[in-house]
């Protein structure tokens, strides 16, 4: 399916996506990096959910990249469900391997496609470290963008992107702000993460 989207100049990106004032932010990262936890924090502060696991991104016009909404549902692991004071008996159990539940988000869901304003890649570092949010440039920016594309493993195993495909990605990242956020392991730093996103990415220090 991801290949069909690619042929239509649309990418399937492994990420969450939220909307704020008509602009979309996609949140990518490895399993355990804190995507769902950060997304939940953003939803509690005025952002709206667009997608929880996969975002379809239209790159046909590189200066106006569009994110499409998916389903009004978020997948949360058991400890996140308890932290948000939700009753597991009211939720659908959907993943035995990772012990996850489906949480309805109809009350804070964005149903319309939105312009992609930025991409955020999460990673975890030592527990005594600070939360760091930095903008990526050059080669690092392109690699981070490619690595979160669902087709990246296939292209890598087949010898890499062809010239035309690589050009699509290059043109997209030239105009797309891309950030890396590093958070400490084992510590709830979502308040600080929220503040940095509001200040650096959305240029606002006010809570919504």
Segments predicted by a language model, with ranges:
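Post-Walker A alpha-helix
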Residues: 38-39
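Glycine-rich, often acidic-flanked micro-motifs
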Residues: 16-30, 44-50, 54-208
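Extreme N-terminal, non-catalytic leader segments
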Residues: 1-22
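Conserved glycine(s) of the Walker
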Residues: 33-34
